């Protein structure tokens, strides 16, 4: 016996019902869909609830997608401690170091954690608390 000769046990697998293959097959002509009507013709569309007001129309409309939304790559102060003292930090430096994956609309520095290094930071945005922490550590931060 070889692998290609293996067969499942009798009755272990159901035979697929082939419909619409002539009247003598028992499932010809209307193919088990009965006579006329919506379900006899084609599929009922997605979300159809038999004429009842569908769920997506019963719920109120909410919000919108702002096409001008800017999303910034966030960097916290404790992420910046990996750099050497006096390093100039830009978006490209952060991407190369693996701190952020991509720049998105720019990089924003937030004040989560502590900064122990004197760094020169040039980013798109920063919080006031982050600015205070960077300057307290002896560094500088500016918007480019």
From Swiss-Prot:
Top-level lineage group: Bacteria
Transmembrane segments: none
Alphabetical GO biological process terms: translation
Molecular function, one GO term: rRNA binding
Segments of skewed composition (Gly residues): 23-35
Region (Disordered): 1-43
Keyword rRNA-binding: yes
The UniProt record lists the keyword Ligase: no
Any single Gene Ontology cellular-component annotation: cytosolic large ribosomal subunit
Keyword set, alphabetical order: Ribonucleoprotein, Ribosomal protein, RNA-binding, rRNA-binding
Residue stretches of biased makeup (Basic and acidic residues): 1-14
NCBIfam families with a match to the protein in the record: rplO_bact (TIGR01071)
Assembly: Part of the 50S ribosomal subunit.
Function of the protein: Binds to the 23S rRNA.
HAMAP family: Ribosomal_uL15
Family that this chain belongs to: Belongs to the universal ribosomal protein uL15 family.
Name under which the protein is recorded: Large ribosomal subunit protein uL15
Organism of this sequence: Latilactobacillus sakei subsp. sakei (strain 23K)
Upper classification of the organism: Bacteria, Bacillati, Bacillota, Bacilli, Lactobacillales
